């Protein structure tokens, strides 16, 4: 599997102009996310175009588990923002609403982290964020 490596971890902290969606990863049958790739891509495109994230990392059951019909899509979105992470995640969910009616009704668990904040959390031994970076799948 193409999980994030330590090298990828450090790429999070390098400035990136615009994230690009890695459709080849989304459609790779080795990853559980391939089953919803066509439904997920419009959401990711909107996210990249409207919110300009540095990176989008998929974690949870669609990355390395066995997603069920009731599974949500867990995303770590790395980006600078003037809003609080919670406010930014709420804005993203609101932007997704029209797609839920026109494309596919996917449920999301969205976590937004500033690159510097994420680096500090990992440096302080934050196991949760470290595991996401180490085991997640970088989608953009």
Which residue ranges define each predicted feature?
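Catalytic core of pol beta-like nucleotidyltransferases
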Residues: 2-55, 64-69, 79-140
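Glycine-rich beta-strand-to-loop/alpha-helix junction loops that act as flexible
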Residues: 59-61
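Short beta-strand->loop micro-motif that forms the acidic, two-metal-ion catalytic signature
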Residues: 74-78
């Amino acid at each position: 599997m193409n999980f994030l490596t330590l090298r990828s971890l450090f790429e999070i902290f390098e400035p990136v102009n615009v994230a690009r969606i890695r459709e080849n990863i989304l459609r790779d049958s080795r990853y559980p996310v391939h089953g919803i790739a066509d439904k997920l891509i419009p959401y990711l495109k909107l996210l990249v175009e409207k919110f300009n994230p540095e990176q989008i990392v998929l974690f949870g059951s669609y990355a390395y588990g066995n997603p069920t019909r009731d599974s949500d899509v867990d995303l770590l979105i790395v980006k600078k923002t003037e809003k609080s992470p919670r406010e930014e995640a709420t804005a993203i969910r609101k932007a997704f609403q029209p797609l839920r009616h026109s494309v596919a009704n996917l449920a999301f668990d969205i976590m937004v982290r500033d690159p510097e904040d994420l680096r500090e959390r990992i440096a302080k031994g934050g196991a949760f964020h470290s595991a996401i970076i180490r085991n997640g799948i970088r989608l953009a």
